[in-house]
Regions:
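Nucleotidyltransferase catalytic core that binds NTPs
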Residues: 1-131
Length: 131
């Protein structure tokens, strides 16, 4: 059975995330590597994350498509976790096609899931803010 890895912040979990994780699970057990709160704040700004780490982990663990969740705080930690897990497959959103992907060299294969344009964390935050 393939070992599958997915990584991201998963802040404001939405249908696009769910579909990506369901797609990943079709290949084997899924380990989700999730950004720490500090890392999200550093990458996305002082108002993020919307959902704290405990909430994001709890939501992900509740999904039948997710087998395990681990936290990382830096690119180095992410790469180390990927190397140690030694996945057969890494699943990324199609927006990563043509980009450098941390830890890709430790995976046998990278699979891309077509992003569902109407679903994004940024869009969800904007929709909530405009109400």
């Amino acid at each position: 059975m393939n070992r599958v890895i997915v990584n991201g912040s998963f802040d404001v979990l939405h249908v696009g995330h769910i579909k990506l994780l369901e797609y990943a699970a079709t290949f084997g057990p899924v380990l989700v590597l999730i950004d720490s709160d500090r890392r999200i704040k550093e990458l996305k700004g002082p108002t993020r994350p919307i959902n704290r780490l405990y909430e994001r982990i709890t939501l992900l663990r509740a999904l039948k498509s997710v087998d395990e969740v681990e936290v990382f705080d830096s690119d180095i930690e992410l790469e180390t976790l990927i190397r140690e897990y030694s996945p057969d497959i890494m699943v990324k959103g199609s927006d990563y096609i043509g980009q450098s992907i941390i830890g890709a060299c430790y995976c046998n294969e990278i699979k891309f899931y077509d992003r569902i344009e109407q679903y994004s964390t940024t869009k969800a935050i904007q929709d909530i803010s405009s109400r």
